[in-house]
Amino acid sequence: MLHMIETRLQDKLKPGLEVENFQKDGDIYLSLNPDYLSGDNAKYMTMYNRMARWYDMSEKWIGPLLHGKSIDKLRRDLMEEIEWKDNLSVLYVSIGTGQDLRYIPETIDLKSLDFVGVDISISMLEKCQKSCAKKTNLQLFHACAEDLPFADNSFDIVYHIGGINFFNDKAKAMQEMLRVAKPGTKLLIADETADYVDQQYKKNHFSKDYFKDATVDLSEIENAVPSEVKEKEMKLLWDGKFYALTFRK
């Protein structure tokens, strides 16, 4: 079984990369390009590494306390933007602790998915590995969105939820996600709007220092989408606190 998983993973890697040559932290493949570890990438990597220990507890208790069941609806709505089918290859960029996996439609057999998750925070990935690895055929990579270690046209599904607002190079990240998606794939890019960042992150005791100078410009996000895509659409969800940007390769 392990050999089969590694063979499938090898087929997705950039030419010249070999599964057996990656350094690993437990079962997490290490592929972080230090050229992108500056500015906001470095700042928010540090933030999530520090918050990882309490992140899931906050999501479980504080989120519902503040927002009730509306946050569950948001996550289900986001998953409905993706064209799920059994037996597909999936790339989730900024997978975090993997809690969104439980909102994948119940009609989908999670263990049939060939699932790869990427995140810039090793601590979030370690939490993800502990909580999600047994639920699906999940392989995790410590990497940045601007330099994915995967070959062109490798994934049936590619999506990103949470983080791109503060990537160093949004256009490069979107180009990378488009590059590794198979032709015809519908991609999802989603994150908080300025309203949520201002009302929540800039006032939260644990995050306010990281976000005090942060700005979110939806036009900047839209303009970062590669010009060659088709069917580009921007939706506002959760009473305008979240956006879902979709397009097709």
Question: What is each of the regions a protein language model found here?
Answer:
Residues Y159:
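A conserved beta-strand element that flanks and buttresses the S-adenosyl-L-methionine
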Residues K186-T246:
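C-terminal alpha-helical "lid/dimerization" subdomain adjacent to the S-adenosyl-L-methionine
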Residues Q23-W84, Q99-Y103, M124-K127, S131, ...:
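Conserved class I S-adenosyl-L-methionine
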